[in-house]
């Protein structure tokens, strides 16, 4: 086990310190720069694809296993200046690619809620650290459900804010038009407190919403809400216990005085293939920077040319799932398949427009189309089933790796549309609330009620 003044490394042989779930990659303590802020007295763990100037930033990959960032991500400085203490960096699927926290160079994460089952991914370590009561809250990233799915499996709250609300500067990109910093906590109160601290414009992030846009975002202020239930989410693959928890949450919502109505968002059916076309294409581009020459893992083998060294470094440094997605992305971007990418962007635009038209509030960046099915929020399950056991997951993945991709079918639509969504634990099963672009506070408001 290698030690530094600031961190303790957990090597891939399974050595752990104070962490029986392997939820951490490095264990460190960074005191806040302000001890009297709104988050004073809290501790947090951050996903290890977010840069910190203390310790390592690995993205759970061999190719970055020795990388030390010279700077903090914007969100790290915000949390520190508002009173929260950083106590560790969490395990994840390598570069955020996975739905079980199985694809990590530092070994898999187990689920504190049920250690026979997968914790979900890619922010499995972040969810496990909260479920295991190791910290007050944790920070993850959500590209296609990577905060909400593990929150559902680990029986905690997982919030993906509106795309652009929270700065991505210092986040190692997987798919930059989808990556969103998310918050995991045991209750909505701590998530809201953290969100209020991080919901700031950052001029270092070109995708961060400017102040003039933030001020124009309409807010919903009403006691009786209308909740939409898209029939496209009523899948035959939904397990009986997921259906039961969904029905229970809808029933409780009605008892609170809110209205529930069926709606239709037809483009949802095309969301999953569109997502994997776009995400892998962006990943192939983003990960092309890792060659092991300037920084990161280097095999130090004697080879005939620099190109051969780069190929060796990347082949040895990336895990199998990351290599698969790079290949898929490069194929999508090739001249023979460019039409697939263009069609995926069109589907995304259609989905954004259709989501926007369904909400009572207007979309600050789009001209809404008219719809007769106006609602304030949407409710749906986070996953089609409860967390599978490790044996079930490994067996299904060995038969067909696409099985793990299907886990994102209920979370991907909100990611493509860039809208806020939260997974709420209802009888041990995650139920998802989604709102209009920018209407994050309303999503958190109803999540706190149910």
UniProtKB/Swiss-Prot annotation:
GO terms for molecular function: ATP binding; glutaminyl-tRNA synthase (glutamine-hydrolyzing) activity. It is an enzyme of class 6 (ligase). GO terms for biological process: endoplasmic reticulum organization; glutaminyl-tRNAGln biosynthesis via transamidation; mitochondrial translation. Pfam families: Amidase. The keyword Secreted does not apply. Keywords: ATP-binding, Ligase, Mitochondrion, Nucleotide-binding, Protein biosynthesis. The active site is at 47 (charge relay system), 122 (charge relay system), 146 (acyl-ester intermediate). Its EC number is 6.3.5.7. GO terms for cellular component: glutamyl-tRNA(Gln) amidotransferase complex; mitochondrion. It catalyses: L-glutamyl-tRNA(Gln) + L-glutamine + ATP + H2O = L-glutaminyl-tRNA(Gln) + L-glutamate + ADP + phosphate + H(+). Allows the formation of correctly charged Gln-tRNA(Gln) through the transamidation of misacylated Glu-tRNA(Gln) in the mitochondria. The reaction takes place in the presence of glutamine and ATP through an activated gamma-phospho-Glu-tRNA(Gln). Belongs to the amidase family. GatA subfamily. Subunit of the heterotrimeric GatFAB amidotransferase (AdT) complex, composed of A, B and F subunits. This is Glutamyl-tRNA(Gln) amidotransferase subunit A, mitochondrial. The gene is HER2.
């Amino acid at each position: 086990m290698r030690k530094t003044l600031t961190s303790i490394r957990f090597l891939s042989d399974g050595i752990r310190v104070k962490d029986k779930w392997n939820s951490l990659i490095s264990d460190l303590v960074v005191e806040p720069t302000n001890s009297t802020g709104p988050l004073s007295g809290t501790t947090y763990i951050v996903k290890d694809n977010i840069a910190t100037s203390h310790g390592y930033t690995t993205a759970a990959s061999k190719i970055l296993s020795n990388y030390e960032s010279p700077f903090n991500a914007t969100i790290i400085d915000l949390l520190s200046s508002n009173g929260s203490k950083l106590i560790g960096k969490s395990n994840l699927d390598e570069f955020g690619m996975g739905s079980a926290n199985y694809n990590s160079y530092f070994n898999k994460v187990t689920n504190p809620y049920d250690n026979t089952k997968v914790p979900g991914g890619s922010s499995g370590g972040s969810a496990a650290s909260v479920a295991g009561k190791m910290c007050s809250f944790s920070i993850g990233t959500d590209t296609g459900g990577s905060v909400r799915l593990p929150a559902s499996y680990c029986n905690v709250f997982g919030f993906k804010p509106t795309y652009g609300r929270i700065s991505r500067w210092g986040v190692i990109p997987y798919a930059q038009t989808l990556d969103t910093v998310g918050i995991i906590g045991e209750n909505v109160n701590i998530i809201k407190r953290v969100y209020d601290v991080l919901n700031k414009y950052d001029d270092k992030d070109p995708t961060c919403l400017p102040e003039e846009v933030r001020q124009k975002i309409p807010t919903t202020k009403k006691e009786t809400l209308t909740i939409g239930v898209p029939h496209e989410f009523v899948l035959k693959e939904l397990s009986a216990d997921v259906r039961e928890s969904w029905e229970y949450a809808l029933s409780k919502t009605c008892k609170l005085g809110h209205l529930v109505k069926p709606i239709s968002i037809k483009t949802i059916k095309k969301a999953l293939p569109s997502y994997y076309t776009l995400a892998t294409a962006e990943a192939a581009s983003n990960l092309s920077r890792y060659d092991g020459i300037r920084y990161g893992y280097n095999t130090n083998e004697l080879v005939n040319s620099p190109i051969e060294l780069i190929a060796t470094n990347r082949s040895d440094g990336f895990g199998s799932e990351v290599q698969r997605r790079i290949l898929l992305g490069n194929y999508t971007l090739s001249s023979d398949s460019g039409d697939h990418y263009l069609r995926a962007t069109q589907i995304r635009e259609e989905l954004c427009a259709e989501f926007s038209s369904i909400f009572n509030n207007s979309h600050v960046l789009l001209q809404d189309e008219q719809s007769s099915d106006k609602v304030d929020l949407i409710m749906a399950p986070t996953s089609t089933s409860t967390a599978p056991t490790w044996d079930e997951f490994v067996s299904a993945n060995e038969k067909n790796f696409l099985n793990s991709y299907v886990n994102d079918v209920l979370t991907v639509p909100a990611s493509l549309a860039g809208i806020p969504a939260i997974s709420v634990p209802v009888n041990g099963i995650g139920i998802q609330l989604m709102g209009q672009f920018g209407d994050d506070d309303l999503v958190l408001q109803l999540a706190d009620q149910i």
